[in-house]
């Protein structure tokens, strides 16, 4: 009973802290001159990380197994993974460009766990025989870490596509306006317009340079986060194959979950191949990664909710027979 109460407290503490953190982020977007807000935000994420860590440890102690057996536990671990990803640039003293993605991801996951899941779905249950293996920690943790990192990388690629699209639209509109004005206005008026354009050239070039730097940083972090997630996904699939051979006598059964994991792996393998090619950097790999965002949610959430296949017991609370 004490552990259940402690788990309940830690769940709400982590959600409250991350809510405060995202409020601070919104304030920094509106008011840049308030000192200490950014540091408070980073400390809040660290506090959230320790709260979720305590929650997982508490769950592990009173359930008697590593907390990765149902939807509730996997979502808590996913939220924990997002908080780890957030702290990577912070620990390396880099500018944290990931906070725009990781902080909303943590609050969305924690909010869903706190508000949307029923009490029955949060209950710990006895593991089915197939899950009573040391491979549970290795396989499921690697898969969830890969989901978290690949989701962050995919969202960064979506942001890259949006910025690039807006930039191209601005260029198109300027060219269109230029053609219309040069066709309808007199030569003298055109020259006056041209002079005013030259006066604003420094401002426009600065703004374009800022967008260029932003897209470069997004591309940099997208590639590195997805590369890390791809490694986790590969390790998760390989460890799952070994575990499947021990449990079911076959390394691969083309179960719906396995099939979609393979599709996910293929999508991000294509991304890595395109991204390495210098002729296709930029929007082309970002487009592939953004498609991967939907594929991951189908693989993680969609297949489990359908309740089909050998992995269907990983979604909801298991019966304690």
Curated annotation (Swiss-Prot):
Recorded GO CC terms: chloroplast thylakoid membrane; plasma membrane
GO molecular function, one term: heme binding
A Pfam family this chain is assigned to: Cytochrom_C_asm
GO biological process: cytochrome complex assembly
Principal subcellular localisation of the protein: plastid
Membrane topology, from the record: Multi-pass membrane protein
The entry's keywords: Chloroplast, Cytochrome c-type biogenesis, Membrane, Plastid, Thylakoid, Transmembrane, Transmembrane helix
Organism superkingdom: Eukaryota
Subcellular location: Plastid, Chloroplast thylakoid membrane
Residue ranges crossing the lipid bilayer per the database entry: 9-29, 44-64, 71-91, 98-118, 143-163, 225-245, 260-280, 288-308
Reported function: Required during biogenesis of c-type cytochromes (cytochrome c6 and cytochrome f) at the step of heme attachment.
Family: Belongs to the CcmF/CycK/Ccl1/NrfE/CcsA family.
Assembly and binders: May interact with Ccs1.
Protein name (database record): Cytochrome c biogenesis protein CcsA
């Amino acid at each position: 009973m004490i552990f259940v109460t402690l788990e309940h407290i830690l769940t709400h503490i982590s959600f409250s802290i991350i809510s405060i953190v995202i409020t601070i982020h919104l304030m920094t977007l509106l008011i840049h001159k308030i000192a200490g807000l950014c540091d408070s935000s980073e400390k809040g994420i660290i506090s959230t990380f320790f709260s979720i860590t305590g929650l997982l440890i508490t769950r592990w102690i009173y359930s008697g197994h590593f907390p990765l057996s149902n939807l509730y536990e996997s979502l808590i671990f996913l939220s924990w993974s997002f908080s780890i990803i957030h702290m990577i640039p912070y620990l390396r003293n880099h500018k944290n460009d990931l906070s725009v993605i990781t902080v909303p991801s943590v609050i969305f996951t924690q909010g869903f766990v706190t508000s949307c899941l029923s009490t029955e779905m949060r209950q710990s249950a006895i593991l089915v025989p197939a899950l009573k293996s040391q491979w549970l920690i290795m396989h499921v943790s690697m898969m969830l870490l890969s989901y978290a990192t690949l989701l962050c990388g995919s969202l960064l690629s979506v942001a890259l596509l949006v910025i690039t699209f807006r930039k191209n639209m601005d260029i198109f509109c300027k060219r269109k306006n230029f053609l219309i004005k040069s066709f309808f206005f007199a030569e003298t008026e055109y020259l006056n317009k041209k002079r005013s354009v030259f006066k604003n050239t420094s401002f426009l070039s600065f703004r374009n340079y800022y967008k260029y730097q932003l897209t470069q940083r997004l591309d940099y972090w997208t590639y590195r986060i997805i590369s890390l997630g791809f490694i986790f996904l590969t390790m998760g699939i390989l460890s799952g194959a070994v575990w499947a051979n021990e449990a079911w006598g076959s390394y691969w059964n083309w179960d719906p979950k396995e099939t979609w994991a393979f599709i996910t792996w293929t999508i991000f393998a294509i991304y890595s191949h395109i991204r390495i090619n210098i002729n296709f950097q930029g929007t082309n790999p970002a487009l592939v990664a953004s498609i991967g965002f939907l594929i991951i949610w189908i693989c993680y959430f969609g297949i489990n909710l359908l309740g089909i296949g050998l992995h269907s017991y990983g979604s909801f609370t298991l019966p304690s027979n």
